[in-house]
């Protein structure tokens, strides 16, 4: 095992052992993302900061490599979804995002070296400056809320069972539901109405028209890995 691999293993052992705005007709429209503001439901106040940021700019930069990281740091986005990294490098990725004055939310399920267990959320909380997590697992979201982090439940709408998962999120009470793919305005509207929770969406959205359709259907914000969407 090389030096990097040894360092990663040591990090894991040390931790585990002890326990918006949208352009419309050439004009920028503040608050166009969502009709009405959300108010925090207790906790650290991070939730309200996220909602306020997405009211100002409803486009979220989703990054999946270092090239995306470099581009998002220069983009006029206030919120970043981190979709890559490992236990050795995630703190550095988050640090750069935070130093740029942006909100950093890590997709905990995608970080190499982390399991989909509650202790992985503790790891991110204790070793990085991440504001919150995304996960498809209810136990991960629940732990994030216990640690006063932002918790976003991601749901892939591939069948009726997935839709039931989205509807049941009202009992889990995440800060938002992130549904993919994003080209389903009817589902966005329905999930928001039934759960009463903020809805984020993304995936396959590449044009301004698609962004506007999702926002008009009631989405709070749109996430995208495409830098051209970040500039809309």
PLM regions and their residue ranges:
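Conserved, mostly hydrophobic/aromatic
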Residues: 72, 137, 214
């Amino acid at each position: 095992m090389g030096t990097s691999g040894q360092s990663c293993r040591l990090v894991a052992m040390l931790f585990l052992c002890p326990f918006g705005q949208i352009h419309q007709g050439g004009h920028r429209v503040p608050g166009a993302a969502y009709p009405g503001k959300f108010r925090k439901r207790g906790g650290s106040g991070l939730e309200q900061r996220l909602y306020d940021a997405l009211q100002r700019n409803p486009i979220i930069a989703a990054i999946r490599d270092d090239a995306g990281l470099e581009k998002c740091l220069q983009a006029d986005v206030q919120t970043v979804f981190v979709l890559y990294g490992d236990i050795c490098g995630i703190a550095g990725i988050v640090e750069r995002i935070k130093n740029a004055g942006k909100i950093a939310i890590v997709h905990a399920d995608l970080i190499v070296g982390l399991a989909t267990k509650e202790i992985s959320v503790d790891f991110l909380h204790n070793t990085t400056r991440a504001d919150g997590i995304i996960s498809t697992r209810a136990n991960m979201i629940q732990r994030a809320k216990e640690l006063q982090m932002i918790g976003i439940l991601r749901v892939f709408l591939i069948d009726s069972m997935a839709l039931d998962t989205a509807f049941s999120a009202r009992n889990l009470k995440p800060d938002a539901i992130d549904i993919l793919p994003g080209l389903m305005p009817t589902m966005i509207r329905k999930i928001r109405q039934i759960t009463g929770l903020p809805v984020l969406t993304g995936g396959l959205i590449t044009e301004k028209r698609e962004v506007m359709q999702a926002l008009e259907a009631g989405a709070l914000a749109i996430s995208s890995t495409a830098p051209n969407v970040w500039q809309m």
